[in-house]
Amino acid sequence: RGIDLPEHGDRTGETDFTPWQVVPELQTVLAYLQQHWQGIRLRANSIGAYFSMLAFAGTTIEKALFVSPIVDMERLICDMMQWAKVTPEQLCEKGEITTELGQTLSWRYLCWVRQHPLDGWQIPTAILYAGQDTMTSRDTVTAFAQKHHAELTVYEPGEHWFHTPAQLDAMQTWEQAHR
């Protein structure tokens, strides 16, 4: 079974896509799953992996499969600030700044991320990383995998969003190998 996060899939009309809203929702979903099923595994992409790690650290999930996970949100936000030529002082002063690419940078979000690091993740994890990922650097995902003893697979021609037939085939093969 799967769920859509706000702004995704069947929930595109919902707009509150912040960790302080999504993490409690995911914890509620996990509580429901634990009442109805014994073995629970997690499959998440991108920011869904980040939110899941915040929500499920310290739980009894058997295994996690992450595709193109955001494993260092602070680094990503700081990179986005650099790309948009926004200083921390500017973001602090304005609170929110919308970039030319349509992304909204938020001082509150950055502060929240800094106050809630991904420290407690100990669930056995396999990661499929795209060699052409522009959201998370290879060094960042490699360091995360080493720190958290995660199995890391790199699909060199992949992009952050696996979407071409070849990328989807590679992802499916990886998923089957990690069931």
Locate the predicted segments by residue:
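Conserved alpha/beta-hydrolase
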Residues: R1-T12
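Conserved SAM-binding loop
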Residues: G2-I3, A44, F66
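Nucleotide-sugar donor-binding loop of glycosyltransferases
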Residues: D4, S46, G131
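Short secondary-structure capping/turn micro-motifs that flank functional sites
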Residues: G9-D10, A49-Y50, D72, W161
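Alpha/beta-hydrolase active-site loop
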Residues: D16-Q35
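The alpha/beta-hydrolase serine catalytic core
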Residues: G39, T59-A143, K147-V154, G158-H178
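Gly/Ala-rich beta-loop-alpha elbow adjacent to hydrolase catalytic centers
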Residues: R43-S52
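Aromatic pocket-lining residues of Rossmann-like dinucleotide-binding sites
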Residues: A55-F56
